[in-house]
Amino acid sequence: MPTAKSSPKSAPKPSPQPTGPLKGVRVLSISLNLPGPAALQRLHQLGARCQKIEPPSGDPMRHFLPQAYADLHQGVRVSSADLKTAAGQATLHKALTQTDVLLTSFRPSALRKLGLGWTALHKRYPHLCQIAIVGAPGEAAEIAGHDLTYMAEAGLTQNLEMPPTLFADMGGALAASEAAMAAIIQRTRTGKGNHREVALSTAALFLGLPKSWGLTSPQGVVGGAHAGYRIYACQDGRVAVAALEPHFAQRLADVAAIKAPKEGALDWRAPIMRKRLTRFFAGHTRASLDAIAASNDLPLHTLAN
């Protein structure tokens, strides 16, 4: 009964190893779906030598999002093994003897069943670092959840609409790659491996901080209250303008022929400012606005729809 085998031919082929600050660092991942592979790809881009062991059935992402899977596994050496079998465990531990960082995304209880709890790992591999991606920190790591539930908890969902992207997963991936670098730095200082937990719910809460501070509320300076930091309609689409700093705001006022009152300065929160800019942008095409932005160094981006 074969329990460890090579990856299918459809697996992405390793690309030339990049150079970077993590050159020489060996990372092994047994993490599936999105956060782990995204973190692994970031580490590869920073120069780490990355390897991944998947179950014989493969990573679910390979089946429902083949292009995303391919993008996230460029430069990663992928193999497969059933970690619930003796042969699979042998494959894993052979790889761990040549690993600096192990990346996981299982619940703590599942890791312990596989013999990969931190106590057991650290005893067997004193120099190994582990980055454990979990849903929520501490005991809550055993509670079922996913990107959507963590985003809802962080206040990043509205009404019945689905979010435009996976903030918790991708934020967690960045946090995991950051944790891997911190683990390597600490090991360099102490000579010992260390364990770091990365919770997707914590990543979602971090990304939601501007909202919790009120920055993105309708009354917030980057939530639409500042007339120079909004999305407007133009003749053939939309335009996102981010003239927030005083020098950018002044340039926008100049090109829109909006002058300050004789006494005082322009009030960018006043409704009249939004009306004037609405009229200005409505009179221009995307091409003309792109030209205006280029010639006046304005932070502006046009959209077709």
Language-model features, listed with the residues they occupy:
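Non-catalytic terminal extensions of PLP-dependent enzymes
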Residues: 190, 208-211
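Conserved Rossmann-fold dehydrogenase catalytic segment
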Residues: 160-167, 188-204, 218-226, 264-266
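Generic secondary-structure signature for well-ordered alpha-helical cores
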Residues: 182-193, 203, 257, 282
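Active-site-adjacent beta-strand anchor residues
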Residues: 29-30, 104, 198, 241-243
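Aromatic-enriched alpha-helical interface/lid elements that frame and gate functional surfaces
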Residues: 227-304
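Glycine-rich beta-alpha junction loops
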Residues: 57, 135-138, 200-206, 236, ...
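N-terminal helix-loop segment corresponding to the beta1-alpha1 unit
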Residues: 1-192, 216, 276, 287-288
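Short, surface-exposed loop/helix-turn segments at secondary-structure junctions
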Residues: 213-220, 256
